[in-house]
Amino acid sequence: EDGIRDSVASRGRGDVYKRQVASVLRGFSAPVVLTQDLSDADRAHLLAHDTDPFNRWEQGRMLAYGSLLGMIREGKAPNKDWLAGIRAVIGDETLDPAYRALMLGLPSQSDLARALSEAGDTPDPDIIYAATEATRAAMADAFADLLPTLYRRHTVDAPFEPNAKQAGKRALSNAALSLLTRNDDGVLAQEQYDAADNMTQQLSALANLVRAGRGNKAVEAFEAQWKADRLVMDKWFGLQVMEAD
């Protein structure tokens, strides 16, 4: 009966009162733009642990923007909280492969330039490019122990089928390949190109070979194979422009 007649009484475990991070708009379906004053640590916590997939993606997007803009403006290193949060997401095999592939993406250089302009800063394309490349290199190093497993586990060995399951697995394995190529000089990309039974896998491998500086033969072989298909050749031209230094 102790405390029952008190006007105010408290009961519970001490750890319940630790500081909490709110997952605002969880499960909300309307297109709401919410401004939150969250620390990088809070955003990284939500990125790693939130049960709402959109909220996780949004916190990852905000952290990626903040990290890249800090690198561009002040020469900072990539945000370690963001890298740790992304690591938690891509290593979670309960999550959809396509979703994890999306989480490995970065804001485009044009979006970064727009964000700088809107903030009153003058975008420098060379600095934006360097920050983006440094971030991808940091991701390749931070996830080095996870990437080979992700690539092998989600490489599709079955005959090509245009379904969501295979597309998601291909997206994740190709996202992993893009980072792995930064540390293996394109060896794995060459293996994928040689073994590919569809254009998607070929094109992904080709882009990585070009990035690694060893794509000349593959570029010629791809042209010879697909030169009659105008849409595919548009992709062929595009990747060479995008990967050009």
Task: Locate each region found by the language model.
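Short, small-residue-biased leader/transition segments that mark boundaries at the very start
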Residues: D2-Y17
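Long, ordered, helix-rich scaffold segments
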Residues: K18-D245
